[in-house]
């Protein structure tokens, strides 16, 4: 690129191309990194969700060591990094907890409060699962998905405990399992 005034277009490609994408857990196999990678960013708008995912992807995400002060209720109740509002205030005002704007919330706060599947160990193909809101009888994963999909299709969330932590399969995953 020339230093000539108005000449801002570059005519050659990038000199050094990356052959592999960056992996944030390549050398850091700590428990904290696994928890950060498994974290679900809920209660935020699409843009803030993308920003938080970028921070996680490139090892720029730093978890909070102690709760921060909420800008609405002025209590030390903010437990998520980079958020400015606590969960109750963000839910009440229906705004993004990170930027404070009245945008569409990608993953609402209320999802983790709905009925869940409890796992009695590490999940395999047909591991015993218990559903707290039903008869509490063990069943295979396919039978539970079929049965609960018919009764609680709109509100059920599968919570799978994996080595790294909790992973949520929302409505789209539920439709795939029950179809």
From Swiss-Prot:
In-chain residues carrying the UniProt-annotated modification N-acetylserine: 2
Signal peptide as annotated in the record: none
Positions of post-translational Phosphoserine modification: 137
Organism in which the protein naturally occurs: Homo sapiens
Pfam family, one: DUF2039
Protein name per UniProt: Uncharacterized protein C9orf85
Lineage: Eukaryota, Metazoa, Chordata, Craniata, Vertebrata
Keywords: Acetylation, Phosphoprotein
């Amino acid at each position: 690129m020339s230093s000539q005034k108005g000449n801002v277009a570059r005519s050659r490609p990038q000199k050094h191309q990356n052959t592999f994408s960056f992996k944030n857990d390549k050398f850091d196999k700590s428990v904290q990194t696994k928890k950060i990678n498994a974290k679900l960013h809920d209660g935020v708008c699409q843009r803030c969700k993308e920003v938080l995912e970028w921070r996680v992807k490139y090892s720029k995400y730093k978890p909070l060591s102690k709760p921060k002060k909420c800008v609405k209720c002025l209590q030390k109740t903010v437990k998520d990094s980079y958020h400015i509002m606590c969960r109750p205030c963000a839910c009440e005002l229906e705004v993004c907890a990170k930027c404070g704007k009245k945008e569409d919330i990608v993953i609402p706060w209320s999802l983790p409060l709905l009925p869940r599947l409890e796992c009695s160990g590490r999940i395999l193909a047909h591991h015993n699962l218990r559903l707290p809101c039903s008869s509490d009888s063990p069943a295979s994963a396919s039978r539970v998905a079929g049965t609960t999909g018919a009764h609680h299709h709109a509100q059920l969330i599968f919570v799978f405990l994996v080595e790294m932590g909790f992973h949520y399969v929302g409505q789209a995953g539920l439709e795939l399992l029950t179809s």
